[in-house]
Amino acid sequence: EGALCGFHAESNAIADFMKQNLLDEGKQDWEFFNKAKPNACEAEAVNRILTFSELLDVPVYFYHLSTKEAVEMVRQAKKRGVKVLAETCGHYLMLTDEKNKGEDGINYLMSPPLRSEEDRIAMWEGLKDGTLSLVTSDNEVFSRKIKEQNLKEDALTNGKIPDFSVPVNGIPGLEERFGLLMIGVNHG
């Protein structure tokens, strides 16, 4: 009694299946990381956890939600009286999956991944209406050198071959997030 269960809500079954399919098709550039963890990956896990929370009358806490589907599920669960708290992170409020494209995409690999503009807006709406209770940092700082350390070398260019499945996930920026968050809050 009195305990609160916290969840990083991503379906490993969906993520593993999607990742393997993409790699089998030779799709390994940074932008495919998001496709390996589609919105359904988070939505399925949130739905499953909310189902048990409601069934067992156990409060739950969701860490760093990133999808419009998950926010809507939490919103509806709260309306039904389910005891649920949820958060998002500054990067899901400020950045989109466009950052995963191109050479610098490796710098924006995180779990859950960055999402679409529609998802980004849904995070702000969730904060505004109280569906989301907190904004956290989930600060995971890894230098580009660390992220690239296990990538294969390209013999022709002496560069690294992109492969979204290899680097550690995480994004720095704790210092900038508070200021960016205040700008967003002031713009409504």
What positions do the PLM features span?
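Metal-coordinating catalytic core of metallo-dependent amide/deamination hydrolases
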Residues: 1-107
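Histidine- and/or cysteine-centered catalytic micro-motif in compact active-site loops
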Residues: 65, 89, 139-140, 169, ...
